[in-house]
Amino acid sequence: MAPAGARDAGIDSGWILSKLARPAPMKTNFVETRSSKLLKSPLRIYGEYGRPDNDTLVRTVRAPYVETTTIRGTQATIARAGHGARTFSLTRVPELASMQASFGALLRGDQAQLQQGFALATTGTREHWRMGMTPKSATLARQLKAITLYGRGAELRCIETQPADARQPLQRTLLASAAMAVSASTPDAALETLCHGG
C-alpha cells in the first residue's frame, strides 16, 4: 500500500503502470552502469531496448561492444560481433524467465501479473515518483533483493537493481531522456542524480 502522501497525490502502482504501458512496437535508449573491483570507474554500456511485437524483447548494445539479445517466448538468443549466435531455453534460467515475464507485464501495464511475482510499493508524486519491486519467489529472492523504478509522469527514467548478495554492486540503467542526457564527459556521480530525477 502506498504511503498517505503518495495516495493524496493520486500516485499508486496502478497509476504508474497505466502510464508506463507501451504497445508494441516500441524502443528506448539506455545507459547501463556496471561496477567491478577490477575497474577504476563503473563500465558504461550504451544501447537500446526494443519490443518489435508483444512476445519479443530485444536488447541491443552499441558500445563498448556490439551485442544483441533477443528474448521471444521461452527462448533467448545472444549474438555478439565476431562470435556466432547462441540460443538457450529460459527454463534453464528460471530467474531470467521470471524477470522477462515481469518486464513484459511492466510494458503492458499489467499490474495483476506483475504482482504475482513482486510486492509493489510507491512513493512520490505524479511528477516525481518511485516504485519498489520486491520479489515474492524464494528462488528469485536468492538472486535479487529489489528493483526500484524512478520516473516523471509517464516516463520511466531509471531502473536500479539490487542483488541479494550485499557484496555485489547495485546496477543502474538510465532510460529515455535520462539516458539521452548522458555523454562521455558526464561524471559518474551525476548518473545517480539523473537516475533519481535530477
Question: Which residue stretches match the model-derived regions?
Answer:
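N-terminal leader/targeting segments and the immediate start of mature chains
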Residues: 2-29, 35-40, 190-198
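N-terminal mature ectodomain segment of secretory-pathway/periplasmic proteins
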Residues: 21-73, 77
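A mature extracytoplasmic/lumenal domain signature
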Residues: 32-34, 61-65, 73-75, 82, ...
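Well-ordered beta-strand positions in beta-sheet-rich domains
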Residues: 44-48, 68-70, 85-87, 146-148, ...
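Glycine-centered tight beta-turn/hairpin loop motif at sheet-sheet or coil-to-beta transitions
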Residues: 54, 64, 81-83, 154, ...
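Hydrophobic residues embedded in beta-strands of well-ordered beta-sheets
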Residues: 56-57, 76, 85, 129, ...
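Acidic/charged, solvent-exposed loop-and-adjacent secondary-structure segments enriched in E/D, K/R, S/T
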Residues: 78-104
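Gly/Pro-enriched, hydrophobic low-complexity segments
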Residues: 111-198
